[in-house]
Amino acid sequence: MREKRTLRPRGGRERRLGLEQVSAIQLKGITKRFGRVVANDGIDLEVRRGEILSLLGENGSGKTTLMNMISGIYFPDEGHICVGGREVTIRSPKDAYALGIGMIHQHFKLVDVFTAAQNIVLGLEGKGAFDLRAAARRVKEISEKYGFDIDPGKKVYDMSVSEKQTVEILKVLYRGADILILDEPTAVLTPQETEKLFAVLRNMRADGKAIVIITHKLHEVMALSDRVAVLRKGKYIGTVHTADTDPQKLTEMMVGRAVSLNIDRPEAKYRDLRLEVKGLTCRDHEGIKTLDDVSFQAFGGEILGIAGIAGSGQKELLEAIAGLQAAEAGSVLYYPPHPNSDIAGYHVPVDRDGEELVGKTPMQIRRVGVSLAFVPEDRLGMGLVAGMDMVDNMMLKTYREHKGPFVDRKAPRALAQRLIDELEIVTPGVGTPVRRLSGGNVQKVLVGREIDSTPTVLMTAYPVRGLDINSSYTIYGLLNQQKMKGVAVLLVGEDLDVLLELCDRILVLCGGKVSGIVDGRNTTKEEVGLYMTHVGGGKEAGERA
């Protein structure tokens, strides 16, 4: 039997508004199957006008599938959807728009060479010539009403990530949406941009809009939402008022058991230089600088966080170190662990010769004995092969080392099964193609494989993106284990709260330059956020201008 509970508010929003909130959407017994997999199992859920509802759940719990049925991407196998008290049939996004429902996806769907106004009206039907000036005026009116800051005539390729997200939200508002669904809306925003977005969402709530947010960030749930609905393994667990709960209770509802929400930052026994980057400069295929004179050191026995607005050079930095991107200038020196570095009180000599990695391919880097692991941002494009099963994906880094015409699959099969057990990967078996796994489970496969290669340098980009709370904390634990083994961990992250708790130091990139390197124990989220939007001279912590 499903556990369902709804707690009454303590001085809730209905009382503050002086009226009883009206139901915007009601889901009754919604079920969706994909083959033998039941993604949603008889879900009942209500979304009210004039509220912000957060939707929580572990990976594979059915959150996105459920919202995709409301927005017309999927059609339910069983159950009913009621909008404004009337049962409706939603077979396409066009049907959803006609009912005032719009979904803003995490990955933007914009045309770079078009302006904001052109993207907003793109796809709308009309008779005769389209009045783009009138559309721009309407966009400006909506922006001023809710507090958006956007230039309707600005090209998308000149926009920041937050401006692009603004255009996506304006697209659904322009089409008359009263019910908005946002999937991980703060994933790539700075703290300051997040606060601006929250202010806009609160304005829309005050205007009577119904807003659903899919997120894994519990502190944002507590700060923004009125109620929280929780799914677990495709089933509806319950809805609680935010004022009556806390992150620990929400986590227990999601996972089904108590989970510690403390992120450890243990002190390693020793710390020695592992990477030294000097004046690293890279350009993209169009000749634009993606990295500009980047210099820093990374040490074994530490986690070095790398923060920055999306597109600030994080991806290019890791790829240049891994030999996947050519460098125009600069060097990357690798220093192997010193044989005596784990002896208490031993100081590793500073005059060691490093191995130059610039100019080497990933295969050449492996052949000179550099044990470097890389978890890329693009999981299925660069990290794994979607059509292969887990066993074959385990072999991608080592199959060239086998001699003879046949490849031994016993060891990679055992590794795949061990990762399933240790990381709680949800899959029918090791022979299932990874493209059939949820995004979070794909990430576990990739991170698990790289960590198992016993690296001395582990570079990972957004390792918990799309992961639920339980899985995220598992990954944090794995990164700390590597740190305590003397591995130099380079972690590109987007959640500053996590970086501040987990990392020993944080390197901040802005426009391809190092704008600051700060101590994770002595800085604040606001300070890091300012470095993300401002080049501050590349000062070390304690040496700021």
Tell me the role of every PLM-derived stretch.
Residues 19-545:
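Glycine-rich phosphate-binding loops of nucleotide-dependent enzymes
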